[in-house]
């Protein structure tokens, strides 16, 4: 069963802001959805399980509300919207992770992306379950098992193919600021029979990015020219006036959709407002989705 969805990423607030901030975020989603014509179109929220990363992160990472706690607060505010999440596996032993996944499923999480160690560590450094092992171990427990897909990363073809061999049913891309995913999936389709669902991720870039640089930091890959070009595009988006910014994002969206639509992969859309949901972000998302969106299930 594919997710066949438009998913909006909702990051849990800092633990010290708790319930009030969570409710405020959920109500903003309802408000901006109605104002932008996306009411009833969003089918999932995607809640990332956040872990502390590198010290040089532009916005300091504070302890976040747990995914389950956050979901329990926002779910009643978002009727008709289901849950997806990411789960770091690398620091939990098998029984602990099984309990966690059982709780996530019981809370109504329909899909879980298994995530490994942060990029400051090497693959396999965590003491817990590797994401690639989790894909096969929890096959029965989690029907929709996702992995992160970074089309610009060296060696990603082999990595993604192995994850599909292990039981991944979908790949959620890193934020796309170029059409590199088109070449990646075209090549992947030629060399393998795997056709997992692909959640194509698009992120709104507000003016604030020019000052803070969080998106630039999130997508960094030193020495990678394709990523350097993407970072330039992010800077251009951040410095553009709203109409031009919308046009640039819609043009990118069209290039990606046109390039991957006929390759045989089920497609879903994952939308992210990295600095928090806003009216302009929803307006941009609405224009993108007017061009193409996953078919509504009848």
What is each residue range found by the language model?
Residues 1-11, 15-16, 20-23:
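N-terminal amphipathic alpha-helix/helix-capping segment at the start of soluble metabolic enzymes
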Residues 36-67, 117-126, 168-189, 270-279:
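Glycine-rich, proline-tolerant flexible connector loops at the mouths of alpha/beta enzymes
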Residues 20-28, 89-103:
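Glycine-rich anion/phosphate-binding loops
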Residues 17-39, 113-120, 124-152, 187, ...:
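Active-site pocket-lining/capping segments in soluble small-molecule metabolic enzymes
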Residues 23-32, 51-78:
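Glycine-rich, positively charged N-terminal anion/phosphate-binding segment
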